[in-house]
Amino acid sequence: MSDVLTGVWADLVGQEKAVGVLRRATESQPGRSSHAMSHAWLITGPPGSGRSNAAKAFAAALQCVDHGCGQCNACRTALSGAHPDVTLVRTEALSIGVDEVRELVRRAAMNPVHGRHQVVVVEDADRITERGADALLKAIEEPAPKTVWLLCAPTPEDVIVTIRSRCRRLHLATPRDEAVADLLVRRDGIAPELAAEAARAGQGHIGRARRLASDQEARARRSAIGELPTRLRSLGDCLQAAEDLVNQASEEAAAATAQVDSAERAELEKALGFGSSGARPRNAQAAMRDLEKQQSARLKRLQRDALDRVLTELTAYHRDVLAIQTGAVRPEEENALRGARLVNAGWSGALHRVADSHSPEHTVATIDAILAARNSLERGVTPLLVMETLLIAMTGADHARW
């Protein structure tokens, strides 16, 4: 078990090394040592490793006189997104454009109102467009004295080179299953056995593990995905399963956005001065249209995220199948705590049936098809077409190409 982190760092599972770097930076004086504070950071790591949590914790520590106690008003408001000198940038769109970046640059140049720094956290810095990066570059090259930029992305290569070359880099590791399970037990009160199962299924993704541990519907959806490879017998099965997966993703996204959409619409109507008589101000139609466009983009992204989770589960499933076929995992190792083992040890029977009914070459081709499906979703290909093509490929038919 890893050492338990405290204060604002408490939720950064398995990131002791990275937290050490951030702590030393908050406690150092500019220019005094190799641990000196930098005005621009690029925090990278695999999905679910806690990039945005690390950035928010760092932002809180920078505002705290005790360097991240986790108890003071500065820490609490920074972590919750309510601190006036910490700007948290999340996007539902596929990119962060130049206009949004220019507004961030303008805000970053302001003096802190209450805090010690003006901190800007960009959770999806890999989505900044080339023109947006040009607008950001000057602000990073010539920062205001108390401004700190915290950019988050999966890898340094995902960020435009002119930006990443001017940032101090910090990489987060994939948390070990034991560390994730310990967090679920300690913080969320999950039963140890369920926490261990969810942590393994989450494959180092803390948010996914928490969802599986706390949401019975999420576990049921995962079980249904685990049954999928053994029940695709015909073209009709593939088409029906693809439709079901897309519909389920749409319903999941709609449920997640319904309340937020309604609140945003009510807030905008109030701001525009909608009267009780139903009369609409002259500029209302354009403003409402813009809001609907933003909400539609968010809905599509959440649907895509839901399908991406399906693809992640299918990748892990066929990784296990390949491990069985090649002898990389022996029967006595399938449920080991670490090392060579099956991610989905609870599905061992089904995995062995699939392994026996297909060749390793077919399994590799299936994994390639899953990766191609993920890339197609990223490019905006119609989700139903993507899933139909993938499931047909999984049955052993000729692989279609997008």
Regions found by a protein language model. Give the residues of each.
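Structural recognition of the conserved hydrophobic beta-strand(s) that form the central parallel beta-sheet
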Residues: V120-E123, L136, T147-A153
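Residues immediately within or flanking Cys/His clusters that coordinate Zn2+
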Residues: A40, D66-C69
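Conserved alpha-helical scaffold flanking the Walker A/P-loop in AAA+ ATPase domains
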Residues: R23-R32, V98-V119, R127, R131-A139
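Conserved Walker B
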Residues: D124-I128, P156
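AAA+/P-loop NTPase substrate/partner-engagement loops
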Residues: G68-V98, D158-V159
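Flexible loop/N-cap segments at domain edges
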Residues: Y317
